[in-house]
Structures are given as C-alpha cells and as structure tokens.
C-alpha cells in the first residue's frame, strides 16, 4: 500500500500548472495538517489498513518546502506506526525554498528521497515557465540535500517549450548528470485548461521529436527509462502506481484507490479543513479495472500480465508482439516504446 500526501501551498502559481494549489494561505497550515491527521485516522480504520503495511509515502504539491518543517512533525508521529521499516518517503521541494535546515529536519523525520522541481538549468526558460528560482539555486539545493544526508535525489525537467532545441536539451542532460542526481522525471509541456498557458500553441515545440532525443540522451547519460516520464533509480512510489497498488490519499485535491473504488478528497483547501472526511467515490467495474491495468502496464517496465487479458485482447497483444512492438517474457507483455504506450494500450483493449 502507498500513501500520497498533498501539500497545496505555493509561493507562486506557475502559468502551466493545473495541480490543486493555493498561494498566500500558509496561515492555514496548522489547521490543514490537523485535518490530514484526522483524515488518516479515519482512512486507516475504514479501509482496514494494518500497521507496517505502507511501503511508500509521497509528499507532493503544491510545494511541500513552502511550509515550515515543524508542521510535519505531528503527521509523521501519526503515520509512523503504519510505515514499513524500509519505507521509501519522498518529499517534493523547490530549489529556492528547500533550505539546508528544512532538508535536515525532514531527513530527521524519516524522509529519505527528495524531488526537486528544477524544470530547467536555463534562466530564460525558468523565467518563461514562471519559476522563481534560478539555475544556481538548483545546484545549491542538490548540494544541501547531500549535506543533509539524502542519497536518493530526483530532478524534474520540462521540455517541449518554444525555447527548447536539441542543443539546449543536451545541456540540460549534462547538468543533471554532472549534479549526480539519481533520478530524472522529464515532462512534456502541456497546455492545461484553466491555466494562463492554455491554448497558446506558440509556446510549444514538437515534443515528439524532442522527446525521442531527450530519452536517448538521458539513457546515454546513465538514466535508464522505466516509465514514460521517469528515468534512473526506480522510485518505489511511481512503480506502485503502475502495479495498481492501493493508495491512501491525504489532503485537499488528493485522489486515493482501494480495491475496486477510487475516492476523491474535497477539491478546495477550506472545504477540506472544514470536513476532511468528505469523499466522492467512484466504483470501478471489472472492465474498467482491466483497462487501467493495460494502460498502466504499457506505460512502464511493469508490463501487462497475459492472464488479465480477454481472448480478443490476447490476440491483439500477440499481433503487436509479431510486429516487434511488444516483447513477451515470463507471462507478461512489455512495451518497447513508451511514447506509443496509449496507442498500444488502446489496440490491445480493442
């Protein structure tokens, strides 16, 4: 089982970001964490969660480092008995707000993986993306993370912007390699609804061409691709999603999954604080669960179990195998090109 914790607080809102987040609301942090503690108690009881069964925790956002580390202590005290002894605990952080003190305190609480929202090592691109840090701060943040005791560090990159060229992307790869990070998450710029970037096609470049180039160069730099957007030392939390593991979800905007249903927390900070037990449930039937497993397996090294496929789906998978699009090994079909994951999944699903 996994645990996702959503920290919606941000210092500023990036123009491409469609995630649930708020600015200027840090004064609500104490009440928010209290609500999450109450929510966790209810979820573990209602969903029959046993102690030491949570194998991974992920603090995402928003910006977890926008909130003082002291606010996390009561929550860690609450969740600790349910964590496996080798639990992977990741916290996202921004280079400008992840101070050495914050990193040390979070490391002492048990966080053992840090994920920096670097996005780029070019200051003009960072400005274009609305980021409030610069390349120098990225390098300092990684150095501080090492000093704080972290030996598992991720850096996020965004590509497919109007400023990107193969030459510049090659330099991005050189920077993450030289920093010695363990993992890279690389995301194509998407023009999401309800964001300032929405519909502005002039902000993008051909991400398919750039994606192929970036994937090749990241792998040449030693970051092996294991999922459509992730490279390097495998993140257990990411892998857990692709394996269709159950996951609890704390915080406003967060989504959880248990057995055959998905639940949605209140999509509003104040509403969540007022009633953290407000949940919208979505029951998934066997066909929907089957489709999800096909899509998730096609997007990652997890692969697709042959035994979950219907006879027509198995026939389609064999066709793709004969065309060299899939490999079959030990009862699973493995995708040879993650960029075609959705098309492959749709073909198999029929």
Report the location of each language-model feature.
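Minor-groove-contacting beta-hairpin "wing" of winged helix-turn-helix DNA-binding domains
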Residues: 332-336
């Amino acid at each position: 089982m996994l645990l996702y914790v959503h920290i919606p607080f941000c210092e500023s809102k990036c123009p491409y970001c469609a995630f649930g987040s708020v600015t200027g609301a840090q004064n609500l942090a104490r009440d928010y964490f209290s609500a999450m503690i109450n929510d966790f108690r209810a979820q573990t009881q209602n969903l029959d969660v046993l102690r030491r069964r949570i194998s991974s925790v992920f603090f995402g956002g928003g910006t977890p480092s926008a909130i003082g580390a002291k606010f996390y202590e009561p929550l860690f005290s609450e969740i600790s008995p349910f964590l496996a002894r080798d639990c992977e605990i990741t916290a996202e952080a921004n280079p400008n707000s992840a101070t050495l003190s914050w990193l040390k305190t979070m490391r002492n609480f048990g966080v053992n993986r840090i994920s920096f929202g670097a996005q780029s090592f070019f200051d003009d691109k960072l400005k274009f993306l609305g980021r409030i840090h610069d390349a120098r701060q990225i390098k300092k943040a990684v150095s501080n993370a090492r000093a704080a005791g972290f030996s598992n560090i991720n850096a996020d990159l965004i590509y497919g912007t109007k400023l990107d060229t193969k030459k510049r992307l090659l330099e991005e790869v050189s920077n993450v390699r030289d920093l010695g990070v363990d993992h890279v998450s690389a995301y194509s710029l998407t023009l999401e609804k309800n964001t300032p970037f929405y519909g502005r096609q002039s902000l993008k470049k051909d991400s398919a061409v750039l994606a192929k180039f970036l994937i090749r160069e990241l792998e040449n730099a030693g970051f092996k691709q294991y999922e459509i957007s992730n490279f390097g030392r495998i993140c257990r939390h990411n892998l857990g999603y692709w394996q269709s593991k159950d996951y609890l979800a704390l915080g406003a905007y967060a989504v959880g999954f248990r057995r055959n249903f998905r639940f949605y927390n209140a999509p509003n900070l104040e509403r969540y604080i007022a009633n953290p037990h407000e949940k919208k449930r979505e029951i998934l039937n066997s066909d929907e669960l089957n489709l999800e497993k096909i899509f998730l397996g096609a997007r990652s090294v997890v692969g697709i179990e042959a035994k979950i496929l219907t006879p027509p789906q198995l026939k389609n998978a064999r066709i793709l195998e004969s065309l060299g699009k899939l490999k079959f090994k030990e009862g699973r079909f493995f995708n040879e090109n993650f960029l075609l994951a959705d098309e492959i999944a749709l073909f198999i699903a029929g």
